[in-house]
């Protein structure tokens, strides 16, 4: 059965084992696309792999670090979570469809029961009509018997009157004998009495029949009233069933709308993944440019160091030349007249002060580097603790089989894995890397990337393990539910009670209401199914909200990446401009220093010949002691 582009297999309202397999077995386009993204990193994963293989091996760690910081691993985890949610919703949809089939079957059975009840009502009405006709006939017979009784009584009274007349006329001799007159009258009386006895027996039998018919009529009235009550209940149930069918149709339409929204969200996620890949490629290009800038900076620093060395040698040569000149000038003077000129003393003092200032600057730079390294060490220790806690958290929460444990294990691990992407912006915002040399920056970055990559691989394994353990727990929790019948499963989901309590409640209902057992149970089932459908709709709304939040997070990541790219591009432009200015200044300074050294070398040739004859060490020590005094 296919619903909204997804394939399902249903066996008596229970999902088969094919639903719990890998994503490749499901025949939905969106889910297969997400599974390919999990395995190979999307449709363009092979191109990205060939491109990365063609690059230098020295940048592999940096590429892994950049892909990790840009949230590729959390995106996979989020897509896996969304796929699991979609599978759960599909299973719930298949279960609801199986329950709808069961409801339709129960409705058919109810309609059959209603038809049987209507047939019984027709039969009972026919019986009522027959009994009424019998009662009418018996009433007519009773009326006839009463009329005959009255006639017999009138005949008896007439006979008695005739007897009286006979007794009164006995005095006449002309009359016949009384016996001759009484004999036929007595015979008629006997016949009349026999008929009266027969009529009384018939009357008693008719009374018995009327009583039995009245009892049958009362029973028929009771059955008719119960049938009417059942018919009213059936009408109410049919109305409720129609309302529930309307609600089911509304829920199905909402489910279709939610499926469409889910497809749209999946398409948006794919677009965001494509943008993330493009940004990763742009960051890689920016990384090559940054490496080139670092090479220029290193060369510039080497040239600055060479310039400083040349300046120091030049100053030393000037000092030595001035000392030689003072020695040559003081050769013909006495010990008391030998004095160092003021210019030489000032130059030596300036030179020594410059060297002292350089040493102080070096000490300050070393102190700052030590402080920054200590702070970085503390930050990385805190990050390691957080990663260890995140590794312990999913391993402990993966053993739980409840969906609450799943949500609690997914939440913090996702945040901590995403938190790894904030390491470089925090370090650069503190300004520690700007004061250190580029070589030390590169080494510290490599060390931090290696440590974070190790812990991130551990977190990704923990993510996969947690999802698999959760899938297994879902299978274990769904298997015992499928063993129970439909009534018990629906009652267990809505009421949350034990199966024993449900069995006792069903037995009590069956014992209490023998006549109303079928419609009452069906009404309860329909109410419970409506409750479960509402819960499923609420769960789907919550999953859509979670997907919207995940999409917003991805959009924020994309915005931060674009901003970081713009900031890095601006920094690169400024650094390149500064490098060009410094290189031009270095070239001008080098030209001036070369001309000065040539002039100084020509002037100091004569002085160097005389300085070789004298003891340069003693004169240098004397000059130093005088300068310190």
Curated annotation (Swiss-Prot):
Coiled coil location: 75-375, 544-592
Keyword Transit peptide: no
Cell location: Cytoplasm, Cytoskeleton
InterPro entries, sorted: MAP70
Stretch list, region Disordered: 1-54, 391-421, 458-519, 578-629
Biased composition (Basic and acidic residues): 578-596
One GO CC annotation: microtubule
Region feature Required for targeting to microtubules, mapped onto this chain: 257-493
Entry GO MF terms: microtubule binding
Recorded superkingdom: Eukaryota
Main location as per UniProt: cytoplasm
Pfam families membership: MAP70
Gene Ontology biological-process annotations: cytoskeleton organization
Keywords of the record: Coiled coil, Cytoplasm, Cytoskeleton, Microtubule
Skewed-composition ranges (Polar residues): 13-33, 393-416, 603-613
Function description: Plant-specific protein that interact with microtubules.
Family: Belongs to the MAP70 family.
Name of this chain's protein: Microtubule-associated protein 70-3
Species of origin: Arabidopsis thaliana
Gene name tied to this protein: MAP70.3
